[in-house]
Amino acid sequence: MSYGFGNSTGQVAGAAFSALTKIDATAIPYKSTPQALTDLAGGQITFLFVDLASSAPHVKSGRLRMLAVTSEKPSALAPGLPSVASAAQLPGFDLAAWVGVLGPAGMPVDVTNRLSVAINQMLARTEVVERFAGMGSEAAPGDAAELERTMRTQLDVWGRKVREAGITPE
């Protein structure tokens, strides 16, 4: 059995899943996710953890089938799909990628606040929410303090997952 990955999120998810399920799966690194998707569709690898947007064309064409989402709970973006936590009976398995908007250290507070207001206004627009959903993402408005808390929490979570999976720097 083998799993492919074209980015660090896929690597950590695959390694964590293999370690937690005690599946002996060989990790196959790819330069990019599209190459891994092609090999998955062609049967060269057994499974792949990948974002919804990258996999959507292959799923729509019938070449690939989605099995579960990596968020702790099922996602509205993938109706009918269970979470890995429930499908594989792995309580607490929660590896959702996220993106934040960052600025340079020392950015004036008034600039940070203006950017935050503008970003939150944009994320509240229906067409933006729909566009994010079409890319397999959910908009999560907030402020700089919330993002900082999220980043600190996620650094701990991902650091623990990397250590649990036995991934070491190359």
Regions found by a protein language model. Give the residues of each.
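Conserved, function-defining micro-sites of small-solute handling proteins
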Residues: 1-170
